[in-house]
Amino acid sequence: MAELILEPYAVVQDWHLPGTDVRWESLLSEYLQRIAQRCAASGKCVIGHIKALSTFADQGYLRISVVAANIPASIEGKAPPRCVSLELTLNVLVYGLDRNIVEKITLETASEIARQRKGEVHQKNFPHASDHLFHSNQQNPSKGETQ
């Protein structure tokens, strides 16, 4: 069996959805579940962990986690009442898919969900995200090291 590579993907997304009845827990569960399903449909891969975290001024937080395309998301915490915007940190660990494919899946899925709800989502990549590619027996170009 060929070894599956891991190219971790991390991004910060700013979500804004109009209205006062945004159910972030179910919306973000749907988002992560769709990411997992689309990753699974994109080729031979193993979903390690897809997780998202949003923190709020009242010291609250919302954490969503998915470990397989066919298992419902785990939810911890909740968004404050009448919350229409949030910053979401998303981490996607999927073995066997190129980072660019994962990035495309997350961006397209977020855009679809926001558009369906007449909202918007903008994303900011973490600096140096492309420096963290994990391929066995390949050189890490940012450090000149072999993994």
Q: Where in this protein do the model-derived segments appear?
A:
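P-loop NTP-binding site
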Residues: M1-Q147
